[in-house]
Amino acid sequence: MADFKLVVSDPKTGKAYNVDVTGPRVNKFIGKPIGSEIDGETAGLPGYKLIITGGSDKDGIPMRGDIPGQVRRRVLVSGGIGYHPTENGMRRRKLLRGDEISAEIVQVNATVAAYGEKPLDELAPKKEKKEGAAGGRAPAKK
């Protein structure tokens, strides 16, 4: 069964929160296209409504809203999601994924459309990093 990370962006505060989606809750996301609204309860955020804005698969290939289905395609693009040209008029063939969430997707991006009673800070707490003696770095070689 596929597990993925849901990155929830809060437009009011400008912060993003990572939520792990595992088990049977994943099935409620599979088949949903970019732009669809989902209930936050499926991600452990009761009272919230989320809008899917994109994602990427296991190889880092981004989802693009104008490619239908769950497929990977080599598309000639001149800008937008997946390609940012350095000069005007440049086009390039890029590998992109369709707009539907499939089992190969490992990250789904979403924004908050409607807020619940509890703030996101409480529902998706920040994970603290463990720091060693050198501040998380390897000791210096002599």
Curated annotation (Swiss-Prot):
Annotated SMART domains: Ribosomal_S6e (SM01405)
HAMAP family: Ribosomal_eS6
Organism of origin: Methanocella arvoryzae (strain DSM 22066 / NBRC 105507 / MRE50)
GO terms (BP aspect): translation
Domain of life: Archaea
GO function terms (MF aspect): structural constituent of ribosome
Pfam families referenced in this protein's UniProt entry, alphabetically: Ribosomal_S6e
InterPro entries assigned: Ribosomal_eS6 (IPR001377), Ribosomal_eS6_arc (IPR020924), Ribosomal_eS6_CS (IPR018282)
Keyword terms of this UniProt record: Ribonucleoprotein, Ribosomal protein
Biased composition (Basic and acidic residues): 118-132
Family: Belongs to the eukaryotic ribosomal protein eS6 family.
Gene for this chain: rps6e
UniProt name for this protein: Small ribosomal subunit protein eS6
